[in-house]
Amino acid sequence: MENKYLDYKRLYKVVDYVINKYPELNRESFEEGSMFIYYPEERKIQISNVIDEIEFEGNKFLEKYLYEEFDLYIPQDKMFIFSILHEIGHYFTFDMNNFDEYCRMLRELSDENYTEYRKIPEEYKADKWAIEFIKNNKNILSI
């Protein structure tokens, strides 16, 4: 599979939509990079316009997981919205008191173990934040 690329304008529409709801978040909280990730020590959210094969395979699992765990269907072409919201969820829910334990749990996981990854408390909290945001702002999936 070749890498797919998203339009950063589209990504920032999602970011701006959330900033409009949560003014304590701002564009300076975001940076462009090679993946979707939250840096808790810096309180920075990295967004990416690249969907590679690994992320694509992970999104297939994620689609099933979100439906089974939260009764929410998000199509593959909208999964980037969930990814952004998940990282923003970390911004609002990550407990630095759990940072060392969080890092330990990540180190113990294999790359293919999506189910266990989603069960890590800090990841689950970010998922729940993203799900609640989507359920309360359904039109975000139209971006």
What spans do the regions from the language model cover?
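Post-HEXXH active-site segment of zinc metalloproteases
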Residues: K78, F94-Y124
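Active-site scaffold of zinc-dependent metalloenzymes
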Residues: E32-K78, F94
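Zn2+-dependent metallopeptidase catalytic core
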Residues: D7-P23
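A short acidic/basic microdomain associated with nuclease active sites
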Residues: L25-G33
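Active-site recognition of the HExxH zinc-binding catalytic motif
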Residues: F82-D95
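Long, well-structured alpha-helical subdomains associated
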Residues: E2-K9, S110-Y124, K128-I143
